């Protein structure tokens, strides 16, 4: 059984070509037994549709602070009390872990500096759960000093960076910067969580069967335990 079974995962999708991989990522999380909620930046919807991710996650996809009827402007909707407020604090508190994938250079920079101009950024600032980043950008952007400084800042905040992989990039160049494959992201997160489990690396002795405590040389106290409970443990 996956360590993600029953976990609530908040997936943040930013606007990069690697966003198309998030469909596979959502499917993998669902197969692992996780509950998935998706937040998309406005730019990410150019690369993958909210309908796709909503269908796969079986949950509505959030993108803006305020959902309004299609035929009404946001200003009119708010004045008339129509529409639905997407509470970023509730979304953040719901999650057991948060993953930003793909994490573009722009989104990384904003999160490292505390910028809060869309629903995903506001939710990140409200998150109390472990946060993972799967960067996706061109080689020179990935190696740029400002990007490296943002990685360092996010790491110091307690976040985890999933290293980008090498290969052909959208620019036609080849090198580091492409987002890790969905299977590798899943494996990375599962391994990271497993390594942080409270009993990881502990040596445990399991006893089974009845116990006997002497009262004196003649009498003693015992029980009729079968030991079955102890034998259940691997």
What kind of feature is each model-predicted range?
Residues 1-131, 138-227, 231-234:
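A cross-family phosphate/adenosyl-ligand binding-site feature
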